[in-house]
Amino acid sequence: MITHLNVTSIYVLDKDEALDFYVNKMGLEKGSDVKQGDYRWLTVRVPGDASTEISLETPGAPLHDEQTGEVMRGLVTKGAMGGLVFLTDDIHGLFETLKEQLLPSEALYP
């Protein structure tokens, strides 16, 4: 019987840039960071919640052939490869924090 989701994956173009974004902009914490040959298992998670981690995956080898990786990188660039939904106890405070850290005001108020 399935009891819990432990790991979910999102595709990113650059694992180090994604790690910086999720940790330093979104406030998540780094989970696992293990290198095995050419593959790097890198996860982030909500601070204090080690039960669910988000694996940051790059399209291409060793998970995909080059043609598939190229198609997937194009989809990631367009923002078409899924997303995440987080819960918060202060949506207005989170909005203000993200507005200051992530978005130029023109992006929110053209």
Regions found by a protein language model. Give the residues of each.
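Conserved beta-strand-loop-alpha-helix junction that forms the acyl-donor binding cleft
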Residues: 9-15
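Vicinal oxygen chelate
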Residues: 1-6, 29-110
